[in-house]
C-alpha cells in the first residue's frame, strides 16, 4: 500500500493535472485518477483548469497514489481542503469519467447528474470526449 502524501498544490497544468510540493520532497506532477478533463484547446478546457485551480491551488492536499502513468506522473485521488477534487471536477461538469481507467463506479452517477443538469461541458449538444479529441488531433 502506497502511503498517503500530504502536500501543497503549487501548480495546475489543466483540469486533471497538478504540481505539488510535499515535505522533504521535490515538486511532483499528479494526474487525477479516473477522470479526463477537456484538453486546453477543447471547449471548457480553460474553464476546467480554472475549476481545479480554484479548488486546489495554494491549498493543502492529501494525495492517495494509485499508480504511475507512462509520463512518470503519479496517478491519484486528490483531496484539497477536504474536497475530493476528482469527484468535484465530474460534479461541476469539468471532466469526464475516464472509462478506460475508472474503478469508482459511483463517479458515473455523479456524471449522469451533471449531464442531466447541463453543467459545464454538458451544456454543449455534443461534447467530444478528451481521449477522442486527442486521437483526432495527433501531432
Describe the role of every protein-language-model region.
Residues 1-139:
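Small beta-barrel nucleic-acid-binding modules, primarily SNase/OB-fold domains
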